[in-house]
Amino acid sequence: MKGGLGNIMKQAQKMQEDMQKAQEEIAAMEVSGEAGAGMVKVTMTGRNEVRKVEIDPSLFEDDREMVEDLVAAAVNDAVQKVQRESQERMSGMAEGMGLPPGMKLPF
């Protein structure tokens, strides 16, 4: 019984370390979202911090409302990519821990 508890504690500690590492990797990653066939690009971190906005110069000849809509769409695209990447990394970790498919980790 004593050895079993020690094993459980070691597994819990490793799981905590793995989760922290995955969260750090997610925070450090960068993704780019696009809209308007790539005419507007937004780069953001895994923490949803926008790092860069690129707008094709030809868009400035068009109306402002369209540019604003494309920027919003590119930001939303980048946010979705961060969420998708985070879910993929965390579900991979859950499978490595022997959790059933579809079981979500507590975050």
Swiss-Prot record:
Protein name in the entry: Nucleoid-associated protein Hhal_0231
Upper lineage: Bacteria, Pseudomonadati, Pseudomonadota, Gammaproteobacteria, Chromatiales
Organism: Halorhodospira halophila (strain DSM 244 / SL1)
Cytoplasm is among the record's keywords: yes
Region described as Disordered: 1-24, 82-107
Family matches, as NCBIfam families: DNA_YbaB_EbfC
Subunit record text: Homodimer.
Domain of life: Bacteria
Annotated HAMAP family: DNA_YbaB_EbfC
